[in-house]
From Swiss-Prot:
InterPro entries: Bulb-type_lectin_dom_sf, Pan_app, S_locus_glycoprot_dom, SLSG/EP1. It comes from Arabidopsis thaliana. Its main location: membrane. This is PAN domain-containing protein At5g03700. The keyword Disulfide bond applies.
Length: 482
């Protein structure tokens, strides 16, 4: 009897232990509240009731969160966010996303892994760590023991650089729309615009002044880092910067977080979080017309006047309907017109290649003979000829009539669409008219058949004109009455 009671008590303890273990694991996996670390065995799926961001992990100060970010309503990306910042500080590969559904699963097994069979997405840190943590500076890390970092998000920036984060020559900041990027050169920071699938255009450059330290050949590439004292520093070796790009908060004691973002208009802006709001702290490009494409394709940006179209005839924002892809102007199927205009200059000309010609005609001829050339801009004073070998974007409007532009404008998608639309519309009207005609003929034919059948049933008696009263059938009726 005592053995039976002991066995029953043992079974109860075992069941209680199993329940506690599995209930603890279930709470950890499906907890709504974010935790301070994720350990091996963690799993999570997106919650269908959440419409923006589902936090899974937070830093110890509660300023940053890591979790599922809902993108375009039905898509999902892994992201690190700040509660008072509209856009995330870090996003896992913005060119790829998973579906926001129960099929998507995130887990940590030493590697951070996300799988979505429906989108054929499978990503992993390929590590063998013990924990996933979020540092107080927003750095997401896979760590082994307490000190060894096997993977960190700071090595894979998106469009944001955070205070004290190293930005190396192997990295790039990319704007959310994918059109602009920031990279390091041998002794400078450069901003680039994607002007076609094959090429990029340099549009902003900040070279190191090398006042306190010099760039040394063979000493390795430079790196950039936001200093808490309010500047973006460039370094090569040691802690002495080869350049200091000052923010508004430069050498002012502030208690907050500094970030630098490459935004969708191509500008590089710095922000300061002071504990209550984000304040603009830096702008690389101060003038609107110095941005890479402020007015759109085939347009002019004139300082103090705003945007206009190169041909002076179309509505702003619709200066052309032409495709923004490269073209072969030597192909006979490529239709285009030529627009000439004075008071035009290429933007960021200091960063563009040029050739010297003796006349405008010679400059134009160089573009005419080049099958890939979209336009040429000529300075009659210096003789500089700038060839634009990509779809025309925003040009710079100037008051100097000696600066002349020659542009090839393709017969655009809009015109072709209008022709197609007109053809479709006319065809539709013709079909409707044909259907109505057939319907009218059919109805007329049915009425004629009906009347003919009635006449045959009545032996030819039918209401008709007065002159028919003299017919043979009518006379026979009268004779019978007599």
């Amino acid at each position: 009897m005592e053995g039976l009671c002991l066995n029953s008590f043992t079974r109860v303890l075992l069941l209680l232990f199993v329940f506690l273990v599995f209930s603890h694991k279930w709470q950890r996996v499906n907890a709504v509240e974010p935790v301070l670390e994720l350990v091996k065995g963690f799993e999570a799926k997106p919650d269908s009731s959440i419409d923006s961001f589902q936090p899974l992990l937070t830093d110890s100060n509660g300023n940053f969160s890591f979790g599922f970010l809902r993108v375009n309503g039905s898509r999902l990306s892994l992201a690190v966010t700040h509660p008072n910042l509209t856009d995330p500080l870090w996003v896992l590969d913005p060119t790829r996303s998973a579906s926001w559904s129960h099929k998507t699963k995130l887990f940590f097994n030493g590697s951070l892994v996300i799988i979505d069979p429906s989108s054929r997405l499978e990503w992993s840190t390929h590590t063998n760590g013990d924990r996933l943590i979020l540092r107080n500076d927003s750095n997401l890390q896979v760590v082994k023991t307490s000190t060894f970092v096997e993977w960190e998000s700071f090595d894979f920036p998106g469009n944001t650089l955070v205070e004290s984060q190293n930005f190396t020559s192997a990295m790039a900041l990319v704007s959310p729309n994918g059109l602009y990027s920031m990279r390091l050169g041998s002794d400078f920071i450069g901003l680039y615009a994607k002007v076609s699938e094959e090429s990029q255009q340099f549009y902003w450059k900040h070279s190191a002044l090398q006042a306190k330290a010099k760039v040394k050949d063979g000493a390795g590439p430079i790196l950039a880092r936001i200093n808490p004292n309010g500047y973006l520093g460039m370094y090569q070796t040691g802690s002495i910067p080869i350049d200091v790009e000052a923010f508004n908060s430069f050498q002012r004691p502030v208690n907050g977080l500094l970030i630098l973002r490459l935004e969708s208009d191509g500008n590089l802006r710095g922000y300061l979080w002071d504990g209550s709001h984000w304040a603009l702290n830096y702008e690389a490009i101060r003038e609107t017309c110095d941005l890479p494409n402020p007015c759109g394709p085939y347009s002019l940006c004139t300082p103090g006047s705003g945007c206009s179209c190169i041909d002076n005839r179309t509505v702003i924002g619709e200066c052309t309907h032409a495709a923004s892809s490269p073209a072969d102007f030597c192909d006979k199927t490529t239709e285009f017109k030529v627009v000439r205009r004075d008071g035009v200059e290429v933007p960021f000309k200091e960063l563009m290649d040029h050739k010297t010609t003796s006349s405008l005609g010679e400059c134009e001829e160089m573009c005419v003979d080049n099958c890939k050339c979209f336009g040429a801009v000529y300075n009659n004073g210096s003789g500089f000829c700038y060839l634009v070998n990509y779809p025309i974007r925003t040009m710079l409007g100037v008051a100097d009539p000696s600066k002349l532009g020659y542009f090839k404008v393709r017969e655009g998608v809009g015109k072709k669409k209008s022709r197609v639309g007109l053809t479709v519309g006319m065809s539709l009207l013709a079909v409707i008219a044909l259907v109505l005609m057939v319907a009218m003929v059919y109805v007329g034919f049915r009425n004629w058949r009906r009347e003919k059948r009635v006449l045959e049933e009545d032996n030819g008696l039918s209401p008709g004109p007065y002159k028919n009263l003299g017919s043979d059938s009518f006379n026979s009726v009268e004779m019978s009455r007599r």
